[in-house]
């Protein structure tokens, strides 16, 4: 059902996670795989003012890739047809089974980025410059392992 994933999941310790069925984000690589698309999150959003991947809650009928591609389209204007999905990795888990899946994809058809109200900016950031940004805490934790995976994909 469309939009049925919106809502918080709460762990026994009180920690909250967005997405009743988990969440997913898109790590989009530029065509030459030297840059990653980052979203500067709107101030009103959870962890607003930080940089992260476009993404959000999974709906009950969606795979992680479906959710990441849908959210990326909503937040950046990049249609799924402009991207080639390369891999998926679970980058966060909760005690009650909630997961955040990062979907790695390569841009295959350049498109103009069109931010929605959830973004104050969208930028293609060089891989080595990602840590220079004020990152969403969960993305900052996941980035070192994601960067290793990105570099491995680029060397294939």
Walk through the language-model features, giving the residues of each:
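Conserved Nudix-box catalytic region and its N-terminal flanking loop in Nudix hydrolases
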Residues: 32-75
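A short coil-to-beta-strand element that immediately follows conserved catalytic motifs
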Residues: 79-89
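Short, charged, solvent-exposed linker or helix-capping segments at domain edges/interfaces
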Residues: 112-117, 133-137
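Charged phosphate-binding loop/patch that engages nucleotide di/tri-phosphates or the phosphate backbone
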Residues: 138-156
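Active-site-adjacent beta-strand/loop module that shapes the phosphate/pyrophosphate-binding cleft
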Residues: 32, 89-113, 123, 127-128, ...
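Acidic, metal-coordinating catalytic segment for phosphate/diphosphate chemistry
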Residues: 1-27
């Amino acid at each position: 059902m469309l939009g049925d994933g919106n809502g918080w999941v709460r762990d026994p310790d009180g920690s909250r996670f967005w997405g009743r069925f988990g969440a997913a984000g898109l790590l989009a690589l530029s065509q030459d795989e030297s840059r990653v698309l980052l979203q500067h999150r709107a101030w009103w959003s959870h962890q607003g003012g930080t940089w992260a991947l476009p993404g959000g809650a999974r709906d009950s009928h969606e795979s992680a890739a479906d959710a990441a591609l849908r959210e990326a389209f909503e937040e950046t204007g990049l249609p799924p047809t402009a991207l080639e999905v390369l891999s998926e990795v679970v980058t966060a888990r909760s005690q009650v089974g909630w997961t955040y899946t990062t979907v790695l994809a390569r841009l295959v058809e350049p498109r103009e980025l069109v931010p929605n109200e959830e973004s104050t900016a969208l930028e293609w950031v060089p891989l080595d410059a990602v840590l220079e940004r004020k990152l969403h805490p969960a993305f900052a934790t996941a980035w070192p392992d994601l960067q290793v995976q990105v570099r491995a994909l680029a060397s294939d």
